[in-house]
């Protein structure tokens, strides 16, 4: 092999190795990006507990959400950014509608679509509601007004949402005595 042939060959090998390294780095970094559901879960984990937020004198953004809600998942990044900007001035609270513990709050705030955002002043009084997937600018304008104790510019704003209705009827099985096996047999159905 001559010296002229080895230089292009080495250059080609170096380029192949560099391309492989770049692809490897991109794959590793890409796999580390949290999914929207993971971001929603981490937001909920880091949120101020409802009991704490309702007892203090700070304004609050109360979000009703569900893990399965695609609009909630899409909003997770915007909420995380807003939390970074506003967490020194207000509390961010997240209540999962799939947790029966929050049924009284779901009913109190008339949650009929998610995500639903309730803006509460420092005294815990609702100042407005926004429902669905909303632009960050709408949420930010409402939060600015909330911390300044001004009227919210975008109350009753509605974006894409996931419909929700609370099942207010107790399940049929809970109406029977748990010691009775008759609650397991349906009329006209034999095994």
UniProtKB/Swiss-Prot annotation:
Residues 165-191 are annotated as: Disordered. The chain crosses the membrane at residues 14-30. It is a single-pass membrane protein. Signal peptide: none annotated. GO terms for molecular function: oxidoreductase activity, acting on a sulfur group of donors, disulfide as acceptor. The keyword ATP-binding does not apply. Residues 165-185 have a biased composition (Polar residues). InterPro entries: Thioredoxin-like_sf, Thioredoxin_CS, Thioredoxin_domain, TxlA/HCF164. It is found in: Cell membrane. GO terms for cellular component: plasma membrane. The keyword Transmembrane helix applies. PANTHER family: THIOREDOXIN-LIKE PROTEIN HCF164, CHLOROPLASTIC. Belongs to the thioredoxin family. Required for disulfide bond formation in some proteins. Acts by transferring its disulfide bond to other proteins and is reduced in the process. This is Thiol:disulfide interchange protein TxlA. It comes from Synechococcus elongatus (strain ATCC 33912 / PCC 7942 / FACHB-805).
